[in-house]
């Protein structure tokens, strides 16, 4: 099986409080994004990587890809103000049919096994996401008051990559752009268009590095992986 992947890496990561794009923050001696790109570079099923960057960081992203020998990163395109705009820019850089994955640049711990399970499911269903059951009790809150406690057994935390038929997800993004609809993730656009989205159970290790605390966890995970 084959797939392409779009990696949005244009966000500034304000919650990381690093003062610059968190993709360039070092994790175990190399940028977070380099770890993420390496997963797809090493996967034989992946044929093409599109990186979506801030316009002023395109050259720096290219240098990063060259430095870490990411030969599949054939295109680096400028993103938009919102993540959704950036993803659509990446999708428009792909011309061939088939499956496309959309994966956060700041999720460096996704595994090839998880990717392959996702791709195999999406090949049958046209849309699939990685997700994990929530561990905590989730309450719906308004102001400082609890409105209701959500049934935890029904709740899953959705991750990336998310996998789609390329033509369908392009159609969903185009319709969303035309109607100024902003989804919470790419799968929500497919749902909005009327398609069902399959769920593939992922791993709690595949978390998004968003805060300084996440970076501490990531360093610990990387150190443990290197000891094995």
Curated annotation (Swiss-Prot):
PROSITE patterns: ISPD. The record marks 152, 208 as: Positions MEP for the nucleophilic attack. Pathway: Isoprenoid biosynthesis; isopentenyl diphosphate biosynthesis via DXP pathway; isopentenyl diphosphate from 1-deoxy-D-xylulose 5-phosphate: step 2/6. The record marks 15, 22 as: Transition state stabilizer. GO terms for molecular function: 2-C-methyl-D-erythritol 4-phosphate cytidylyltransferase activity. Keywords: Isoprene biosynthesis, Nucleotidyltransferase, Transferase. This is 2-C-methyl-D-erythritol 4-phosphate cytidylyltransferase. It catalyses: 2-C-methyl-D-erythritol 4-phosphate + CTP + H(+) = 4-CDP-2-C-methyl-D-erythritol + diphosphate. Belongs to the IspD/TarI cytidylyltransferase family. IspD subfamily. It comes from Halalkalibacterium halodurans (strain ATCC BAA-125 / DSM 18197 / FERM 7344 / JCM 9153 / C-125) (Bacillus halodurans). Its EC number is 2.7.7.60. GO terms for biological process: isopentenyl diphosphate biosynthetic process, methylerythritol 4-phosphate pathway. It is an enzyme of class 2 (transferase). Catalyzes the formation of 4-diphosphocytidyl-2-C-methyl-D-erythritol from CTP and 2-C-methyl-D-erythritol 4-phosphate (MEP). The keyword Transferase applies. Pfam families: IspD.
